[in-house]
Amino acid sequence: MPALFSPIRFGTLELANRIVIPPMCMYSAEDGCATDWHLMHYGNLAQSGAGLLVLEATAVEARGRISRYDLGLWNDAQVQALRPVLAHIRRHSPDRE
């Protein structure tokens, strides 16, 4: 089996394979909140079978954004909007952690 499809361990984290989906700025958030678009986009990527999926740029304060359409985590509404997206990713990812 090629190494690309072999599990790999980083400390206590074990990935099902060595395929990584890097972060891509999608500029689709509304007021820093994830939307149904994020649920569909990341849900599809999670189902790809990649061992690691890295989310896009996510600002921890409004003035740290690179665009007004970035995801944010500086208020409770943004955290709540991202929860279903992360749950969907976990449900459909190969490692489900």
For every predicted segment, state its role.
Residues M1-E97:
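Flavin-dependent oxidoreductase catalytic cores
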